[in-house]
Amino acid sequence: MATVTDPRDIILAPVISEKSYGLIEDNVYTFIVHPDSNKTQIKIAIEKIFKVKVDSVNTANRQGKRKRTRSGFGQRKSTKRAIVTLAAGSKPIDLFGAPA
């Protein structure tokens, strides 16, 4: 991604799973991000969208699962995930929109 004006083009969706939900207590959040984005762009986008201080960003490319269909085999879409650690003392991100 050469130039992105909107940080919401980089951060696509939060990952809501049992593992990612357990990591929220440690100020670690997981997001599905644009496949061409790098760690610096992800950090800037998280800080702009949620107004928090990011400590570190780890990324992982997940290969799409091979699935059987009636006519043969297909493949789910591959995704890139970002595991974002917030700085100590930073306010938590409200992913669920419920009052605390």
Swiss-Prot record:
GO molecular function terms noted in the UniProt entry: rRNA binding; structural constituent of ribosome
Domain of life: Bacteria
Pfam families hit by this protein: Ribosomal_L23
Keywords for the protein's UniProt record, in alphabetical order: Ribonucleoprotein, Ribosomal protein, RNA-binding, rRNA-binding
InterPro entries, sorted: Nucleotide-bd_a/b_plait_sf, Ribosomal_uL23-like, Ribosomal_uL23/eL15/eS24_sf, Ribosomal_uL23_CS
One GO BP annotation of this record: translation
Cellular component GO terms, alphabetical: ribonucleoprotein complex; ribosome
Assembly and binders: Part of the 50S ribosomal subunit. Contacts protein L29, and trigger factor when it is bound to the ribosome.
Function: One of the early assembly proteins it binds 23S rRNA. One of the proteins that surrounds the polypeptide exit tunnel on the outside of the ribosome. Forms the main docking site for trigger factor binding to the ribosome.
Entries under HAMAP family matching the protein: Ribosomal_uL23_B
NCBIfam families xref list: PRK05738.2-4, PRK05738.2-5
Family: Belongs to the universal ribosomal protein uL23 family.
Name recorded for this polypeptide: Large ribosomal subunit protein uL23
